[in-house]
Structure formats: C-alpha cells, structure tokens
Amino acid sequence: MSNSSARPESLGEYLAHLPLSDEQRAELASCTSFSELHQRLAANPAASSAEAVQASVGPRLTVGSAAELEEAEMLGVDGSGRLCLKIAPPIKRTKVVPEPWRTNVLIRMWRRMTGRPNAPQPPKRELPPARWRTVGSIRRYILLALMIGQTIVAGWYMKGILPYQGWSFVDFDEIVNQPLWDTVVQVWPYALQTSILILFGILFCWVSAGFWTALMGFLELLTGRDKYKISGSSAGNEPIAPEARTALVMPICNEDVPRVFAGLRATFESVAASGNLDRFDFFVLSDTNDTDIAVAEQQAWLDVCRETKGFGRIFYRRRRRRVKRKSGNLDDFCRRWGGEYKYMVVLDADSVMSGECLSSLVRLMEANPDAGIIQTGPKASGMDTLYARMQQFATRVYGPLFTAGLHFWQLGESHYWGHNAIIRMKPFIEHCALAPLPGKGAFAGAILSHDFVEAALMRRAGWGVWIAYDLPGSYEELPPNLLDELKRDRRWCHGNLMNFRLFLVKGMHPVHRAVFLTGVMSYLSAPLWFLFLVLSTALLATNTLMEPQYFIEPYQLYPLWPQWHPEKAVALFSTTIVLLFLPKLLSVILIWAKGAVEYGGRVKVTLSMLMEMLFSMLLAPVRMIFHTRFVLAAFLGWAATWNSPQRDDDSTPWGEAVRRHGPQTLLGIAWAALVAWLNPSFLWWLAPIVGSLVLSIPVSVISSRTRLGLAAKDEKLFLIPEEYATPQELLATDQYTHENRWHALHDGFVRAVVDPRQNALACAMATARHGQAAPIEALRAERVAKAIEVGPKGLDLNTRLALLSDPVALSRLHEQVWAEHNAAWIDVWRASINNDPHSPLLPLHPENAGQPSLVGA
C-alpha cells in the first residue's frame, strides 16, 4: 500500500466528491497523504493505511446522511468489526432438500421385480375430495373425445384427398422377387402419403386442442357463470391476518436496472396505498455477474429505499455462487428466509403488480387452504414498437380466451408461469426444490424451465394449482422485436424439451403430464409442420417426375387413375382455417359484447384484428424455421445462451436481420423455384409459406420500428385498455423509468473503485466477509496488484467480481488508486462523469416534489 504524499489537486478532487461542509473540506485539505485523510475520516490517527481506508468506509458512506441511515437502523458491523449495510434480514435457515429424479421407468420396474425397493419419497398429503376434481376429470375426458373425434374425421377427409388410395394395390409378394429400385418406385408414393397422413393427424389434433380451449374460454367469459373460479372464493376486502406475511421476490440477472427498480418502486407504492404494506417484504435477488450492472443495482437499491422510505422493507442480495439459475436463486432465498413467510409472490424483472391484486392474492390463499399456487393472468403492456404493440394486442384480446379455457379444463390442476403468482411457502420448500436431471448431455443437469415442474411437484404433493384469470392488476412486458422474442424462445424450447424427461416420473398428475407434453408440442410442432411441407413437396415431385402406373396387375382391363377430390380439399382447408382463426373472431365478438371503447371502438378493433391476423400469417413460417433449428440444436447438444431479454424499445438493424433471416430468404426463393418448376399451379397453395420466408428480412426490421408503433397508436390501432386508461402503477413505472435513465449509473465498477462515496457503498454492501488468514491476504494483494497493473480495461471478469465482493480488497484498491494517482483508473472515471453528466457523482437524490406517488393516492 502506497504512503506517498498526496498531490493537492488529487486531494481536492477527492474531497470534492464528498458532500462535506466548507469547514470540513478546508480542514481535511491540509492532509499530506491519503493515509492521513482516511485516518482523519475514521477518527483513528493510529490506524495503519490498510486499517484506515476500511475504517473510513462508514464516514464516507454516512457523511451528509447519517441520520437517515441510523433512523432506519441500516448500519451494522460484521464479525470483523467492519461497517456494513443491513441490506437483508438476519438469516434464519430452513432445510431445502431437492428429491433426486427417478426418470427411468424401466429401472423402477426392474427394482420392483427383483424385490429391491426404490428410494422412499418424502411424505405427501392427499388433496381433499372436492366437486371440482370430479368435474375437471369429466371435462378433460370430453376434451380428449372432441380432439380425437375431430382428428379422425379430418384424417378421413385428408386420406380421400391424397392421390394414392391405400396400400391395396401394392403386391407384397411381388416386392420380394423384384429389383430393389422397382420396389422403391412402387412403395415410395404410398410411404410418402402415409407419413403425410400421420403428421397431419398430429398437427390437426394440436390445433384442435387450442380451438376447444379458446371456445370454452369464450363461453366462460361471455356468460360470467364460472362457479369454480378461484377469485370468487374470497370474502372481499377483509383484513389480512398478521401471520400471513408475504415476500415479494424479484430474481434478476444482468437486467435493465432503471426499468427493474422503477417497476419495483411502483409496486411498492401501490402496496403502501392499499394499506397492507406491513404484511409484505420485498426482495431483489440478483444473479448479476456484470460488475457495472451490479454496482448500478446497489445504487438503485439505495435510491429506491430512500425515495420510498423502504429501508427495512426492501432488501437486496447478490449471489456469488450462481448455481441452478433462477430456480437456484429462489432456493437460496427459501433456504435463508423462506421460513419467515407464509407466502411468496414471484415477480419477473419486468413485472408490475398493483397493491389490490397482491392483497387479493393473499386473501385468496387464506380462503383456500388447499391451494399451493395461484397464478394471475398478467396483461402485456408498456412497449411501443410495432411488433410489440401487435403482440400486446394479440395477448390482450385473444389471451383471456385461452387463459379462461385453460382454467375450464384444468381447474385446480393448472399452469404456473414462473412469475406474477403467489406460492404457499411451506409445501414449496418441502416439495418443489429442483434436483438436476441425471445423466449427461443437453437434456441433463440443472432444469432450465422450472415453472411447469414446480407446479407439477406442488400438485403431486397434494396442493392445488389455480389460475385467477380474471384478477386485474398484474402486468408484464413483451420482447420489442421478433429476434428478441426468438432468443427467448430458444431458451424456452430447450427447457420444455428437458422437462419432458419428467413425463413418466412417479406420482405426477395426468394433467401435468399433459402440460409437459403440450410444452414439448409448442416447439416440436414446428419441425413436424416443416416436415409435413417437405413431404408434401416430395409427393408433388413424385407425381410430376415419376411415370404413373395405370396397370399394375396382369390382364387388368381398366386403368387405375390417381384420384383428386377438390370438394374434400376445400372442405378440409375451410375447417382448418376455422379452427385457426375462429378464436380470434370470437375474441373480438366478446369485446363487441362487453364494450370496445378501450380498444379503439368496434371498427378499429376489428381492423386491428385483421391486420394482426395477416401479420401472424407472415411470421408463422419464419417462427417455424427458427423453432425447427432450436429443436435440432437442443438434440445436437448446442448450448442455449441464457442472456437477459431486451427490456426497452430497441429496433432490429438491417445487418442483424440479414444475418438472422438470410438463410430463410434463400430457402424461400429456392423452394418457390422448385415448386414452380414442378407444378406452377401448386405454387399458389405454397405462396403463404415461401412468400413469408422471402419477406422475412424487411418484415422483421420494419416491425421493430417504434415510429410505426406510435403511429399506429395515434390511429387507435392495436389499442389495449392499458393504453386507453393507463393504470397508476404503469404510469408511475414509466415515469420512474425515465427518471432512472436520466440519473443512470454507468461504468459502475470503475466508480466503485475510484469514487469515494460509491466505493464506500460497494464496500458496505459486499458479501464476502473473509478473515485475515495468510492465503486470503496473499490473494487480496495479488488481485489489487493486478488491478493496478492492467487498469479497468484489462481486468478480467472473475477478478472484477472477486474485488467487488471483498470489502477489504476493494477499499485497499481504492486507497492505492488515489495514493498513486493511477491515471488508468482515474481518467476512465473522469471520462465517465463527463460523458454522463446526469448520473449521480454521489448517492445524492433530487427532491421528490412533483413526482407521482401511489402512497395515499
């Protein structure tokens, strides 16, 4: 540690970034070294240089704001006597033990046959008998019958459309004795047709399931007579019992910090306005490994606590061991603090929830002691690109039908989507911890899509899982453009394929086995559809290029003509169109019946629906190709990158669109040319597919433009109720986001090293509390020396993370940078301040006058 004399200009610059009085600054300006400066700040002239800089963390942090932090009882000391901020409650550990997966049914059968018992499972309760369970089973049998019956009829029509009718004209005795090529020529058309028919049946059944779900949702919402809806079980606004403590947890990882803490603040203030704030605690659970973002999170946490007086109510924790991604983050919370709460509400990084919605969820849990999870139906809002606004419109208009329909078929054995839901803590801790999947390869290891699995485990343990589809006040955001949505889809695709390994796990309820199956089909339907189109093209080539055999038997008097029944083709095509698009029409009819003013009026909502239908037709083949790639990548073991999704209105550059969509465009051109060469008349049937692929680049770019989205909004196109009459929570989120961006902290790690107050905050919030053992001290010295030598631009991520987590090393690096006036660090810090003049040089905050507040609203 350097003890060289301090340059007067360096000392003056350092003191300028501490909110001191003129007298204090003049007194400290007489220091001859930074060691002396820290000794005076710490009021300990006998302290060594290393001890002084650590001891000065408290004065540097609290100068000008000591009363505020002391009043909130936020200051404490660790086991070594170092000052720290109480950013989380005291740890009260609860045992969280995941049950190992036994996914191989053959091994279980073999162990049973050989008299070796399987490992015992944790004790589970039986869900008490209830009428809804019987009703749900009957409804699901009806759904299965409707799907299968509809598919059989459609398959029969499809069989009649195909040119080669059955295998009766294939002589299998002759096949044995004839040359192989003749066998291929004879069998090939029938094999193609059989494959096409099988694929058609699978895909039609999948479409049929969606149709019947939407239809029943339409009837539920139109009549409003759902006697089994979970939201009807609460008495209303009864007081929440003191023991019904609820933790709102927001797992984040390298997110958009201004938006995250804006939504958190809006939610906090809405809960305060509801009068139930004393029943809720808020936890930001960070898995961030970008040190700049991590420092910005620390500052944002301090800001939001000061602005809302949320000290002791809003907590922050950043993990250093990032195991099992989001589910591991939740496990860590449950292990440390879960036993202190009766319920947990999981929020996504873009989630916003009203205080009334959260209070209603707690009341519903209290009124339904057999409910383990209650999922809300979050409304998408807040984005302005044309693509996002069309998707917001689609989810807002069509989504309620499908959500209500899911509830109709599933009742208390339903979905959980991982956020905007309330969970009963005790059974979740005991039964829903996720062990890694056994084995090796792409489908082994930590579970990626945890939500469906946790819902299945909750139901297996004897607790209900419900969707409160009609509960208002739950919001989320969607990706701003097609490519960002597809990046998210790749993660979800891999996760859903992994989850299917649990299909045969013992004890899973049949409904949740079906949920695993539908999760797989959400993505597997894409390669099946693509294969269906490829085989159809191959059948066209067969009919065009292969010489037809009109006489296949000796002495045959009449030729066997390939058959074509256009009336059946038209009927089947019309039926498929009805299944695909009738739910959208029913959604608009429902809006007409309930009132269309909030959607721009009847004419505008109808026009928006037609435009969205055209847009979805354009994008369906593009998604098909991408999802096919994702499925193949998962099976080939290509890793899916789990980066945080885009949270703002970024448009797609032309260069990126060409890179991502270029192969699809070439495929569309080649496919169209092939079909035109084979049979130009067939090109009309394939035009929606190949045309969409050819146009994918401009459609992707143009739809990502915010200007077009706002222009459509001005014309009341794709309008949703949250835009027509924006809820106070969303208004506050939008304003706080703009304010946070204005004061956003950039180059956070450099500031945590150089800036006097930012360094004090980072040291006080550091989580590594190691002692003074020789190996630890040697490692600290090595890291500090490396940081001084290579500067901020040459420092690797692991060293950055280690320094940010260690208050001792970080404070020593801070002292040494200033003592040596290290230009590599200080110049970057100065440049950051000059380039970003609106970010806080210190953790100081503007007056809150004029800012929207939900407290007392």
From Swiss-Prot:
Keywords: Cell inner membrane, Cell membrane, Glycosyltransferase, Membrane, Transferase, Transmembrane, Transmembrane helix. This is Glucans biosynthesis glucosyltransferase H. The chain crosses the membrane at residues 141-158, 197-219, 514-536, 570-592, 605-627, 681-703. NCBIfam families: PRK05454.1-1, PRK05454.2-1, PRK05454.2-5. GO terms for biological process: glucan biosynthetic process. The keyword Ligase does not apply. It is found in: Cell inner membrane. Belongs to the glycosyltransferase 2 family. OpgH subfamily. Its EC number is 2.4.1.-. GO terms for cellular component: plasma membrane. It holds the Pfam family Glycos_transf_2. Its main location: membrane.
